[in-house]
């Protein structure tokens, strides 16, 4: 899953929850309506959920609170430790978007929040192909992540971040693999999914991809 970012996850584990709470000005808009975004994923998820990039367990906790059956996949030991320290049940397993243990149930939904951009477009295609083979008809993928309408919109946000002095945000936008909606839609459709996209703030969209018959 772009494990080149693993050291970043380990470093970020202690402060991640402060960031998503809006305490970091550079990422305030990225995480605006964070709790609403998580609730929307939970609302769209089925009963048996495979979650990638569990992180500190915020989405995991929301899914469990809604009585979902959850199998979490997370590559960072520090992130998993932070989740367990918050009292979240240990449903976490080592792995990533591309390499992960099989859950003990047949998932009807695959979810992720703020993580799919760690894969290149080619890796995204590989991952979605794998998920297509896991899910039955009417199964779905629900991902929330930073994405852009097109490359021009992506570049505009980079320029805006630099103008505001948000150097870390600008660097993230330039170096990580944030998808464009048209590319992501094409990948899903080629793998047998119908998609809908829902904008949640200036950066984050939720994509809901349903597997066709």
Curated annotation (Swiss-Prot):
EC numbers, comma separated: 2.1.1.-
- Keyword terms: Methyltransferase, S-adenosyl-L-methionine, Transferase
Keyword Nucleotide-binding in record: no
Sequence positions that bind S-adenosyl-L-methionine: 53, 74, 96
Report the enzyme's class at the first EC level: transferase
GO biological process assignments: methylation
Record-linked InterPro entries: Methyltransf_25, SAM-dependent_MTases_sf, Uncharacterised_MeTfrase_YrrT
Query: Does the entry feature the keyword Transport, yes or no?
Result: no
| GO MF annotations, alphabetized | S-adenosylmethionine-dependent methyltransferase activity
Alphabetized Pfam families for the sequence: Methyltransf_25 (PF13649)
Q: What does this protein do?
A: Could be a S-adenosyl-L-methionine-dependent methyltransferase.
Which protein family is it in?
Answer: Belongs to the methyltransferase superfamily. YrrT family.
Report what the protein is called. Answer: Uncharacterized methyltransferase BPUM_2363
């Amino acid at each position: 899953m772009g494990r080149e970012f693993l050291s970043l996850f380990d470093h970020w584990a202690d402060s991640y929850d402060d960031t998503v709470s809006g305490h970091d000005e550079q990422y305030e808009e990225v995480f605006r309506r964070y709790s609403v975004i998580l609730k929307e994923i939970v609302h769209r998820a089925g009963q048996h959920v495979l979650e990638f990039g569990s992180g500190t367990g915020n989405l995991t906790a929301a899914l469990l609170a809604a009585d979902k059956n959850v199998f979490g996949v997370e590559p960072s030991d520090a992130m998993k430790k932070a989740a367990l320290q918050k009292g979240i049940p240990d449903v976490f397993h080592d792995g990533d978007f591309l390499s992960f243990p099989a859950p003990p149930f047949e998932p009807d939904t695959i979810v992720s929040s703020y993580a799919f951009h760690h894969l290149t477009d080619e890796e995204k295609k590989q991952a979605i192909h794998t998920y297509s083979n896991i899910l039955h008809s009417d199964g779905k993928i629900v991902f929330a992540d930073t994405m852009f309408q097109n490359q021009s919109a992506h570049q505009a946000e980079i320029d805006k971040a630099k103008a505001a002095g948000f150097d870390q945000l600008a660097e993230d936008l330039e170096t990580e693999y944030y998808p464009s909606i048209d590319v992501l839609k094409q990948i899903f459709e080629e793998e047998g999914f119908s998609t809908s996209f829902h904008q949640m703030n200036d950066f984050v969209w939720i994509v809901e991809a349903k597997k066709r018959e």
